[in-house]
Amino acid sequence: MNNMTAIVPAAGVGSRMQADRPKQYLTLLDKTVLEHTVEHLLEHPLIEHVVVAVSADDPYFANLPLAHHPRVIRVDGGKERADSVLSALEYVCQHRLSEWVLVHDAARPCVTHADITQLITTALAHPIGAILASPVRDTMKRGDHLQQIVHTVDRTALWHALTPQMFRAQSLRERLFAALQQQVTITDEASAFEWRGEKPALVAGRADNLKITQPEDLALAEFYLSRNKEKS
């Protein structure tokens, strides 16, 4: 069980950050966001390799010390997240790196090892796989095209999907490929299974496993990382 592979799709542009480079290459404390994310995955005792999918013309990755790490593998990503994940899966399956993969957002540097371990334990015992998720706590409203409230949505069964998301590499590869062939919109790995009527497990994860999408998220991620370092 100690040879899991993590996949990090990192070919996105992240235009909402309004920065001069993709958000995964913005500086967070003393490193890039991507370095924090990948190094954190590598430090988990059950993860052997991390496959990073970046744009073919990415000018940043090769300049990171991370690019030369013996357990980090670079592959070309695609236009959409699903394309990048599929490219990484092709490598994992071709080289038989591991039976299972954990797909994790490049812009989520704050995931805890405890959450990763709980995800792995749950996924291995489930027939399909599992994802980290956080129960919705806020009151949810459905709006119309004028941004007016239509009604309040029952939040009882609603979850925020987080990452990592863990599935068997071959199963995820087959489902992603089939969905893309049918032009099905795939927003995360679990949705490739949902499309087939399959139900991955939900693993309650920490809400501080935030995804950096807005400029203010950098400051919050810095706080979480600094706090976690003090605790360790």
Swiss-Prot record:
The record marks 155, 211 as: Positions MEP for the nucleophilic attack. Keywords: Isoprene biosynthesis, Nucleotidyltransferase, Transferase. The gene is ispD. Pathway: Isoprenoid biosynthesis; isopentenyl diphosphate biosynthesis via DXP pathway; isopentenyl diphosphate from 1-deoxy-D-xylulose 5-phosphate: step 2/6. GO terms for biological process: isopentenyl diphosphate biosynthetic process, methylerythritol 4-phosphate pathway. The lineage of its organism: Bacteria, Pseudomonadati, Pseudomonadota, Gammaproteobacteria, Vibrionales. Its EC number is 2.7.7.60. The keyword Aminoacyl-tRNA synthetase does not apply. It comes from the Bacteria. The record marks 16, 23 as: Transition state stabilizer. InterPro entries: IspD (IPR001228), IspD/TarI (IPR034683), IspD/TarI_cytidylyltransf_bact (IPR050088), ISPD_synthase_CS (IPR018294), Nucleotide-diphossugar_trans (IPR029044). HAMAP family: IspD (MF_00108). It catalyses: 2-C-methyl-D-erythritol 4-phosphate + CTP + H(+) = 4-CDP-2-C-methyl-D-erythritol + diphosphate. The keyword RNA-binding does not apply. Belongs to the IspD/TarI cytidylyltransferase family. IspD subfamily. Catalyzes the formation of 4-diphosphocytidyl-2-C-methyl-D-erythritol from CTP and 2-C-methyl-D-erythritol 4-phosphate (MEP). This is 2-C-methyl-D-erythritol 4-phosphate cytidylyltransferase. GO terms for molecular function: 2-C-methyl-D-erythritol 4-phosphate cytidylyltransferase activity.
